[in-house]
């Protein structure tokens, strides 16, 4: 299972949004990273540019500065070539500026004494006559720079505003695409679960499945929303910063480039430990969800049997284990986050000082203040995305583990092949041919089952608990598939039908009726838009639920909450009956359907069933044998085999297992009476 490829495949579903976001981000980063270059130009060309060579100009121009009645123009501002015989310089010494009206051979350490400017560089030293400039005179020399500085400031401000809008755009698009990816992923997971075989859920608590759909996908959402955004943003920032560093100084840029393999090695070491801890955390979190779900569902039993302490102890063990691994993860994050970033940052600045400090000792290698400013600025900016990446390592690993759990579920083979409901109603003839079945390999629960139910017949399945009654119906619905033999409907093997087609012929009523949150009507129709309100009411009337509708203020629109907890078990079963009948099935399955119904309600349903059985093949599982006396066929099962078959009179005449069960129940009834 390749987690990265699957995550990438989901991202490509919304590649237009992602590509647009990355383009916007690239433009925004480019605009923002232009700032230090603008600062460098302002420092070198305008603020410190006053120390460049000045020439006495023969004619005035717009860049000329008047000083003592003479016009001076800076070397890089000359519009026309002039004689360089008359050269002048301005030097800063401390907080003061001095004018030197002659050529200067070299630059170096500067001192001023008795109107003399002395410049020393190594063994060389030379003194020049110098005049200290007043504030007004200094301002005159800076005046030509004001326009350029204002333009650069406006450009910098404009780029910042420009960058903000593009940053907002990329952030919005990345968030939107991430939300859509997770929406799609959750839909896929939930849809896949709908198609999973019942066998999958036999050994998997519901809380664990819920945790994968909610908690794990939410962790993946953090990957796309936060981690992906941070990594893409930081990656583009780092690329832009390294490009700028190479433009400024290739040698030092290569030194800074060593940070990249350090981060890679860092991530490898981190993942080695974080992956294990996160797997434990997510697994225990699923167990906690399962435990909470189980406890809430069984709260009545827990309180009735005073099992609160034991339940709390089991929960505390899980919670303590979760706390332990969370602390281990915290220690790992503390060790490998800001501390290491600060160490790398300090090493980078040591290299910077070493490089520029060494260069300053060589007159030919003196670096401008603007370049130094830009380098320091870019180095500071470089560690912002590095810090961002490091801070997301924990979320990245958590998301990878969560993605692995979600994709593991998605890779589970489902049994619900694509198919449409049957276009024509089946006749209802059902045949089992030498069927054998085992839930666990080597432990057969059905052995060589063979029987035929003709159209419209009622077939009752009786036997002790574990004899295989429900397993026969599980095979008929294809909740499970038989290892041997075949099951046919109207002469056609059910294994040659899609499950959608097969189940469109059948309706089922279980021993424990399950109602969904919604209304009485939605529980009957299961939100099938093809079913009209009148059809819903008719189904309820057929099963004798009309008194229930009259009792409820809103009729079929009466809300149903928490599995129908406000309704009696008999009322819930009536709605379950109506649900089965509303879809007009050719085959009706009643799995202990009257077990939770009082005698009066059972009498109502029995009358209704006499009507709805007409034209339908009905399978009944019943422990109360008095309810199946009129069955056309009764199959008695024992240890997975049919040991007796026939109608009530025939089986009573045999005086076998059926006779014994019937007489036993009859005796109990008389005893109670």
UniProtKB/Swiss-Prot annotation:
Residues 430-664 form the ABC transporter domain. GO terms for molecular function: ABC-type transporter activity; ATP binding; ATP hydrolysis activity; ATPase-coupled lipid transmembrane transporter activity. Its EC number is 7.6.2.-. Keywords: Antibiotic resistance, ATP-binding, Cell membrane, Membrane, Nucleotide-binding, Translocase, Transmembrane, Transmembrane helix, Transport. ATP binds at residues 463-470. Residues 18-398 form the ABC transmembrane type-1 domain. SMART domains: AAA (SM00382). Induction: Induced by several classes of structurally unrelated antibiotics, such as erythromycin, fusidic acid or linezolid. GO terms for cellular component: plasma membrane. Inhibited by ortho-vanadate. One of its GO terms (biological process) is transmembrane transport. The chain crosses the membrane at residues 18-38, 146-166, 223-243, 245-265, 347-367. Gene3D superfamilies: ABC transporter type 1, transmembrane domain (1.20.1560.10), P-loop containing nucleotide triphosphate hydrolases (3.40.50.300). Overexpression reduces the sporulation efficiency possibly by modulating the function of KinA. PANTHER family: ATP-BINDING CASSETTE SUB-FAMILY B, MULTIDRUG RESISTANCE ABC TRANSPORTER ATP-BINDING_PERMEASE PROTEIN YHEH-RELATED. Belongs to the ABC transporter superfamily. Involved in the transport of four structurally unrelated drugs, including doxorubicin and mitoxantrone. Transmembrane domains (TMD) form a pore in the membrane and the ATP-binding domain (NBD) is responsible for energy generation. This is Probable multidrug resistance ABC transporter ATP-binding/permease protein YheH. The gene is yheH.
């Amino acid at each position: 299972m390749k987690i990265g490829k699957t995550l990438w495949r989901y991202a490509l579903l919304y590649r237009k949004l992602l590509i647009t976001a990355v383009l916007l981000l690239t433009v925004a980063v480019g605009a923002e990273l232009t700032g230090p270059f603008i600062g460098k130009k302002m420092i070198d060309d305008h603020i410190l540019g006053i120390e460049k060579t000045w020439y006495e100009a023969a004619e005035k121009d717009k860049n000329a500065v008047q000083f003592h009645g003479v016009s001076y123009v800076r070397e890089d501002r000359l519009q026309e070539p002039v004689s360089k015989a008359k050269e002048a310089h301005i030097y800063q010494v401390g907080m003061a500026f001095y004018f030197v009206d002659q050529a200067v051979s070299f630059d170096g350490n500067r001192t001023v004494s008795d109107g003399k400017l002395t410049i020393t560089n190594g063994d060389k030293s030379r003194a020049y006559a110098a005049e200290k400039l007043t504030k007004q005179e200094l301002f005159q020399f800076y005046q030509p720079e004001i326009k350029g500085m204002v333009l650069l400031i406006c450009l910098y401000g404009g780029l910042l505003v420009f960058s903000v809008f593009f940053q907002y755009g990329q952030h919005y698009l990345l968030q939107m695409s991430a939300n859509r990816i997770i929406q799609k992923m959750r839909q896929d997971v939930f849809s896949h679960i709908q198609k999973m075989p019942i066998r999958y859920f036999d050994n998997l608590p519901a809380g664990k499945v819920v945790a994968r759909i909610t908690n794990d996908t939410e962790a993946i959402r953090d990957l796309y929303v936060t981690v992906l955004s941070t990594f893409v943003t930081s990656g583009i920032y780092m690329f832009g910063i390294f490009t700028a560093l190479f433009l400024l100084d290739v040698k030092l840029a290569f030194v800074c480039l060593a940070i990249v393999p350090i981060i890679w090695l860092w991530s490898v070491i981190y993942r080695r430990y974080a992956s294990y801890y996160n797997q434990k955390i997510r697994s225990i979190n699923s167990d906690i969800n399962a435990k909470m779900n189980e406890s809430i569902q069984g709260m009545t039993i827990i309180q009735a049997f005073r099992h609160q302490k034991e339940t709390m102890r089991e929960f505390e063990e899980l919670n303590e284990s979760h706390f332990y691994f969370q602390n281990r993860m915290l220690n790992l994050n503390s060790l490998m986050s800001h501390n290491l970033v600060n160490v790398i940052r300090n090493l980078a600045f040591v290299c910077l000082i070493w490089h520029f400090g060494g260069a300053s000792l060589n007159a030919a290698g003196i670096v401008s203040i603007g370049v130094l400013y830009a380098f320091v600025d870019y180095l500071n900016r470089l560690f912002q995305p590095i810090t961002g990446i490091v801070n997301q390592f924990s979320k990245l690993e958590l998301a990878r583990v969560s993605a692995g759990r979600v994709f593991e579920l998605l890779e589970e083979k489902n049994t619900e092949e694509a198919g449409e409901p049957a276009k024509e109603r089946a006749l209802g003839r059902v045949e089992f041919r030498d069927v054998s079945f085992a839930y666990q390999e080597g432990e057969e629960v059905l052995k060589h089952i063979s029987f035929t139910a003709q159209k419209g017949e009622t077939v009752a399945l009786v036997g002790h608990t574990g004899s295989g009654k429900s397993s026969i119906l599980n095979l008929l619905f294809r909740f499970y598939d038989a290892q041997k033999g075949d099951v046919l409907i109207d002469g056609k093997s059910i294994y040659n039908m899609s499950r959608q087609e097969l189940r469109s012929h059948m309706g089922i009523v279980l021993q424990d009726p399950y109602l969904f949150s919604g209304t009485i009507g939605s529980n009957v129709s299961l939100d099938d838009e093809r079913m009209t309100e009148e059809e819903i009411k008719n189904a309820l009337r057929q099963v004798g639920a009309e008194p229930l509708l009259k009792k409820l203020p809103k009729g079929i629109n009466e809300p149903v909450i928490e599995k129908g907890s406000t309704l009696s078990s008999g009322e819930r079963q009536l709605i379950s009956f109506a649900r089965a009948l509303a879809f007009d099935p050719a085959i009706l399955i009643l799995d202990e359907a009257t077990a939770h119904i009082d005698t009066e309600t059972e009498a109502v349903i029995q009358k209704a069933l006499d009507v709805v059985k007409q034209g339908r093949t009905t399978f009944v599982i019943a422990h109360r044998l008095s309810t199946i006396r009129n069955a056309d066929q009764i199959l008695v099962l024992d240890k997975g085999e049919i040991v007796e078959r026939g109608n009530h009179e025939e089986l009573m005449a045999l005086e076998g297992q059926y006779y014994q069960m019937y007489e036993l129940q009859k005796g109990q009834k008389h005893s109670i009476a």
